[in-house]
């Protein structure tokens, strides 16, 4: 008998963030937004900083849990496991902290206009800006394309 749900686990280095039965998971991979559900072909994909949309088993078609997720990877087999450095629910995002981190990164970029694009500092500033934008979007309810 076919099932319309699959087990999802979201794991960070410090904790099991989420475990539950879901109907659909949408993540931002390096190839763009991708959705995974029960019966999906096996896959292992790298994740980019982005939004994680979770439609839990039995939820209404337009009812989603949304969180901000950092880089990592998703492993899709008989279950779906997401490994990531950081993840947080929309309701847990501290906007003061987000805006402060964003301002610091923007300030660094202004003070270092000639920095090498490949330098660790430049890559870190760009990553902080990307995370801040995603966290802001998620706090506002998410912006799925």
PLM feature spans:
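Short, charged, intrinsically disordered terminal tails
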Residues: 1-5, 143-145
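Acidic/glycine-rich phosphate/pyrophosphate-binding loops and surrounding catalytic core
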Residues: 87-145
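Compact, glycine-rich, soluble single-domain proteins
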Residues: 7-9, 13-100, 104
């Amino acid at each position: 008998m076919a099932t319309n749900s699959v087990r999802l686990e979201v794991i960070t280095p410090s904790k099991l963030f989420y475990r539950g039965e879901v109907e659909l998971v949408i993540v931002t991979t390096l190839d763009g937004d991708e959705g995974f559900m029960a019966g999906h072909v096996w896959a292992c994909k790298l994740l980019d900083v982005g939004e994680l949309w979770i439609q839990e088993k039995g939820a209404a078609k337009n009812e989603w849990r949304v969180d901000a997720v950092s880089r990592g990877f998703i492993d899709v087999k008989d279950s779906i496991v997401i490994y990531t450095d950081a993840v947080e629910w929309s309701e847990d995002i501290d906007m003061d902290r987000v805006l402060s981190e964003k301002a610091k990164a923007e300030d660094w970029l202004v003070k270092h206009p000639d920095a090498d694009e490949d330098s660790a500092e430049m890559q870190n500033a760009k990553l902080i800006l990307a995370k801040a934008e995603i966290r802001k979007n998620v706090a506002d309810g998410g912006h799925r394309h």
